């Protein structure tokens, strides 16, 4: 029997990032990306790509930025993507990505957006 090697995957996660004391969407997005980047870099995860997520408006079909501000507090949908190598399956790749990113971002909720084989 030959030794099996795992597969390589591109895993895209979404994070629900809260930003306090902001007045507009651009500030909320910039602060969220900067704070997430600092935490990821502190854990040596500078290879994780960070972007703001978009949603499709149910009324008009246009894309809108994933940021909502209420009472000076913003919820920003961040998109975090990374490559996972030698994973046993897509599910294993997701667990690896969530573990690595989750350790750096601590209490930030993460969800799976997409997993594609490389």
Swiss-Prot record:
Belongs to the UPF0212 family. This is UPF0212 protein MK0748. PANTHER family: UPF0212 PROTEIN MJ0068, UPF0212 PROTEIN TK1194. Signal peptide: none annotated. InterPro entries: UPF0212. It holds the Pfam family DUF555. HAMAP family: UPF0212. Coiled coil: none annotated.
């Amino acid at each position: 029997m030959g030794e099996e090697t795992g597969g390589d995957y591109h895993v895209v996660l979404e994070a629900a990032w809260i930003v306090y004391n902001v007045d507009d969407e651009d500030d909320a997005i910039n602060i969220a990306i900067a704070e997430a980047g600092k935490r990821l870099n502190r854990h040596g995860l500078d290879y994780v790509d960070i972007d703001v997520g978009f949603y499709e408006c149910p009324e008009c079909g246009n894309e809108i930025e994933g940021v909502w501000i209420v009472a000076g507090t913003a919820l920003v949908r961040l998109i975090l993507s990374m490559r996972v190598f030698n994973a046993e399956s897509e599910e294993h790749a997701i667990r690896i990505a969530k573990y690595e990113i989750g350790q750096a971002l601590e209490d930030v909720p993460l969800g799976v957006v997409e997993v594609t084989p490389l």
